[in-house]
Amino acid sequence: MKTTDRTAVAMGLDVHRQFSTVTARNAEGKIAWRERLEHEDRDDLRKHLATWPRGMPVILESSFGWEWMCEELEQAGLEPQLASSRKVAAWRNARGMAKSNRTDADLLSELGRQTDRWWQVWLPPPEVRDRREWMRYRMSLVGLQTGLKNRVHAILHRHGILHDFADLFGAPGRRMLTRLANDAKNPRLRESGRATLKGYLQLLDHLRRQIAVVTRTIYRHLRVTPQAKRLQGLPGVGPILAHTILAEVGDFGRFRSARHLSSYSLLAPRAFDTGEETDEAPKGRHVGHMGRRTLKWAWIEAGHGAVRRGGRFREVFDRYTDGGKQNRNRGYILVGHELCRTAYAISKKETEYRDDPPARPGSSKKGAASREHARRRRAKSQNSRPGTGQPDPPMVAVG
């Protein structure tokens, strides 16, 4: 490690698994020094970071390894800043530069001297990073549990074992599965199937205990803020989903509008057509792919509960799915999008959610409750079967 030049005003840090490449620039924009930081000895790394000028901006890419490095930089009195990896790559390609460790560090150090912050992304504080870690850990456990349940279903399908349980993994269903796994005389399940089923059930029990432990920890450590209470007032949003949304969003105020939050949540429709005279999209509109997939999952998951609850979100779902008869996945995405926009509005205005807000003075629009009542009256007049959105079959005269 080289001796630090005190005239440096900005630094670029290209972080890798075992080392980092550093480029420092002075006030004239010239390179003050370059060096390579080894990550093996953390104490030696901290001592060297302490020699850097305090308060100096250090720019890192928002990719692998930025979290722990930002913590080390903050402890050393430096000012870490995150740059969008996608924008840095586009800038490098526009300048015709080949990708290398030194090139990336040089480009990042140039960003620190620019007054325009087009490249900067939000750096979540430590409490938000901790919240994300807890919620993602629980999500990973639930995902493993779902995968094991699907494998148990596959075992029953392969052996032709049918059941009429609404929830196979409820108390009655688990008793049936336990009997199958322990009954060596049952001819419908071979020995290999019994051993596999028994192992899966043991893993499910272990996962269920782990999920219960982490859920209690989440409720104990995560503070119930006024913002979390407002989110839980939305239809379909419970405590876990509320904390998941807060963990991924961090601060609603960092988004300029509900459209920006929807785009970040991968729910905003966008078109990829050019040269059209109108705003129509012949190839159709699709959601984006650059954002928080966890947020997209959370909003759509809340959309399922909001549709079951009814109200204006059920009205949105029915409008785009013809009463739930076609393209239901698209309907849930639209409801999730509407929930996202509503959450942004109540967070910015710091108000509680109302299912039937009063109409603005002079507005001719009816409230959500009135629209829901009218929808139910229309469905009843059409003699439709409740819960399906489909009409009753016509009566056929016999004889």
Regions found by a protein language model. Name each.
Residues 40-57:
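Short, basic/hydrophobic alpha-helical segments
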Residues 81-120, 133, 140, 175-176, ...:
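Short alpha-helix plus adjacent loop in nuclease-associated cores
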Residues 230-233, 239-240, 244-328:
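Phosphate-backbone recognition surface of nucleic-acid-processing proteins
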Residues 19-42:
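Short glycine-rich, Thr/Ser-proximal phosphate-binding strand/loop in the N-terminal lobe
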Residues 114-132, 183-186:
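Short, charge-rich amphipathic alpha-helices with coiled-coil/heptad character
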Residues 134-230:
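Glycine-rich, often acidic, oxyanion-interacting loops/wings at catalytic, nucleic-acid
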Residues 2-26, 108, 141:
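Gly/Thr-rich phosphate-binding beta-strand-loop-beta motif of the actin/hexokinase/Hsp70
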Residues 317-399:
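Low-complexity, acidic/Ser/Thr- and charged residue-rich accessory regions of DNA metabolism proteins
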